[in-house]
Swiss-Prot record:
InterPro entries the UniProt entry points to: DisA/LigA_HHH, GIY-YIG_endonuc, GIY-YIG_endonuc_sf, GIY-YIG_UvrC_Cho, RuvA_2-like, UVR_dom, UVR_dom_sf, UvrABC_protein_C
GO cellular component terms, semicolon-separated: cytoplasm; excinuclease repair complex
Molecular function as annotated in GO: DNA binding; excinuclease ABC activity
Subcellular location as annotated: Cytoplasm
Database matches in CDD domains: GIY-YIG_UvrC_Cho (cd10434)
Domain GIY-YIG: 13-92
Alphabetical list of PROSITE patterns matching this protein: GIY_YIG, UVR, UVRC
Gene3D superfamilies: 5' to 3' exonuclease, C-terminal subdomain, GIY-YIG endonuclease, UVR domain, UvrC, RNAse H endonuclease domain
Record organism: Clostridium botulinum (strain Loch Maree / Type A3)
Protein name in UniProt: UvrABC system protein C
């Protein structure tokens, strides 16, 4: 039995970290303290200064524990690590632990590559970023590959080494084949220097040079070459447009501000690299209530830079708590000096004001959209409750479906809707293991049995304090189950629920002869629903989603199997050649279309294996 009064009296007057727990033993808050005794006791003292969030948290505290550290900076580091590990309910939590993508030029290599990475290390490479949108990094790298003939392979290529046969990229003009020693290191570096100029925003010089070459080609009646150079100029200008200079300095800086409306807060981050905005990101944190902005920003920085891959030289904020301590922590993580600054006037202050305006607009738009969706979903759940005569609104709904082709690779899927919205983090997939052939009823019985067996097992582990509630994958049961089918599927579900003595209403989602959602079956009767109403739209959405999720899983399994069988059936093609073929040709279709010469261009292929591939796909 935890004696709260005794534990409060015996708190040490040393720095450390404290962990608040609820009645399930789940950690709901992690904090650091310069003096544990003073900080922890503050929570249990009646005070008007406590925010609504703190008051709500204290009501849920059943016990606490603490860890003593040697210094406040050690406490801060431990706090960040524990928050990342436990994801406590009452800490500021960003939706994901983002490691933003960078473009990496591997300058430590004799013949550098341009690749995407989410990890910045001191390895002699040059990094550009971070980019908020991962797809934009992919697009930029693809555009660079089309414009500059640089290698894309992972081979360890050294100048003067033994030459090897170049791959297909050389034959189609996408690479200068340093592997075959067709280009000198110094010549290749000139190409890489242009890539670096482009990524640094100095693309105008490159464009000018390309234009001169284009005009020269046109004068010499080399129209195909001129057209190719024109296309490359368009690509370079497209990349250059992605980044706009707003400052004349060349520092790496982040600008962070926030806007609160009294209940929720939006944080906005602008990333400036070499004087250009390379991206921005926003985070909505709900239920911050009247927490002061300096505390919010301090907590946000710990969460944001505790997870992100890159810490800039300077971070600008409107105000902050524990500034010196956070600077020390950031510098330790970065392994070089990082500074937090609060601009009072000038262009830095103007940028920070712009960030705040963006945060305000983002929060207002979020609230407007949220309120509109909430009103819509609330009405749907209310109508669903009335149509089915349920005791409560079905806040959590789980839908199940089976997918197979002629009995092979049977899979089951479970999708979840909470408060009317899809919750993909709770979706689950089941590979059918006990059923032979195409038997949807037995397959459905298997996945439902597994789902509720897991759930009951997790609930017991939570009750025995062997599992935290937030770690459970099946411990939350639905208020309503929707089966993708009629009475047969409903009866299977009810049979499984009765086995476990679980009482949950079960409906069947039925379709017409044109495979369109027709309505619901409940308690043995089909319920007439307005086909143009919001409930019908919602049911259709659930049915489409569970079917899509099952089909996508089935396709992935089927794809793996067909991929495997096709390649493994080709004589003289082992694991090494199989990997090389896929790496160079990207797909089975491309391998089918490959010529004898193209197959031979793969280093691991010889005449015999190339002939085997051609013969197999003849």
């Amino acid at each position: 039995m935890f004696d709260l009064e005794y534990q409060l009296k015996n708190l040490p007057d040393k720095p450390g970290v404290y962990l608040m727990k609820n009645n399930l033993g789940e950690i709901i808050y992690v904090g650091k303290a310069k003096i544990l005794k003073n900080r922890v006791r503050q929570y249990f003292q009646k005070s008007q200064k406590h925010s609504e969030k703190v008051k709500a948290m204290v009501k849920n505290i059943e016990e606490f524990e603490y860890i003593i550290t040697d210094s406040e900076i050690e406490a801060l580091i431990l706090e960040c690590n524990l928050i990342k590990k436990y994801r406590p309910k009452y800490n500021i939590l960003l939706k994901d632990d983002k490691h933003y993508p960078f473009i990496k030029v591997t300058l430590a290599e004799d013949f550098p590559r341009v690749i995407s990475t989410r990890k910045v290390t001191k390895d002699g490479s040059k990094y550009f970023g971070p980019y908020v949108d991962g797809s934009s990094v992919k697009d930029i790298i693809e555009l660079i590959k089309k414009t500059f003939p640089i290698r894309t392979c992972k081979k360890n290529i050294v100048e003067g080494a033994k030459a090897i046969r170049p791959c297909l990229n050389y034959q189609i003009g996408l690479c200068k084949a340093p592997c075959a020693q067709y280009i000198k290191k110094s010549e290749y570096r000139e190409i890489i220097d242009d890539v670096i100029k482009l990524l640094s925003g100095k693309h105008l010089d490159i464009v000018e040079n390309f234009k001169l070459n284009m005009e020269k080609a046109a004068e010499n009646l080399e129209f195909e070459k001129a057209a190719m150079l024109r296309d490359k100029i368009n690509i370079i200008e497209k990349i250059g447009e992605k980044q706009k200079i707003i400052l004349n300095n060349f520092d790496n800086e982040d600008y962070i501000s926030l806007y609160s409306d009294g209940k929720d807060t939006c944080f906005q981050v602008f990333f400036l690299r070499n004087g250009k905005i390379v991206g921005r990101e926003h985070f909505i944190i709900e239920d911050t209530f009247d927490t002061n902005s300096s505390t919010l920003i301090s907590n946000f920085l710990k969460e944001f830079y505790g997870g992100t891959a890159y810490i800039p030289k300077t971070i600008y904020v409107p105000n902050i708590e524990d500034e010196a301590l956070l600077e020390q922590w950031l510098t330790l993580k970065k392994e070089s000096k990082s500074t937090i600054k609060i601009p009072i006037k000038g262009e830095k202050k103007n940028i920070l004001d712009l960030v705040e305006k963006n945060a305000k607009t983002t929060l207002e738009n979020f609230k407007l959209k949220y309120l509109q969706e909430k009103a819509l979903y609330d009405n749907v759940l209310k109508d669903l409750k009335n149509i089915l005569s349920l005791q409560e609104e079905p806040i959590r709904i789980e839908a199940f479906d089976i997918s197979n082709i002629q009995g092979f690779d049977s899979v089951g899927s479970m999708v979840v809707f909470e408060k009317g919205r899809a919750k993909p983090s709770d979706y689950r997939r089941f590979k059918i293991s006990t059923v032979k052939g195409a038997d949807d009823y037995k397959s459905m019985k298997e996945i439902l049995t597994r789902r509720f067996q897991h759930g009951l097992s997790e609930i017991k582990s939570i009750q025995d304090r062997k599992l935290e509630f937030s770690s459970g994958k099946f411990s939350v049961f639905p208020d309503l189950i929707l089966m993708d089918g009629g009475k047969g599927q409903i009866n299977i579900a009810l049979e499984v629920l009765n086995t476990f003595n679980i009482d949950i209403p079960v409906c069947g989602m039925v379709k017409d002869n044109k495979h369109r959602t027709r309505g619901l079956i409940y308690n043995g009767e089909e319920i007439i629903i307005n086909k143009y109403g919001s409930v019908m739209k919602f049911i259709t959405r659930v049915q489409d989603e569970v079917h899509r999720f099952a089909i996508s899983y089935h396709r992935s399994l089927r794809g793996k199997n067909s991929f495997h069988s096709l390649l493994d059936d080709i004589p003289n093609i082992g694991e090494k050649r199989k990997k090389d073929l896929l790496f160079n040709f990207k797909s089975i279709d491309n391998i089918k279309k490959a010529t004898y010469e193209e197959l031979l261009s793969i280093p691991s292929m010889d005449k015999k294996s190339a002939e085997s591939v051609l013969e197999f796909f003849k």
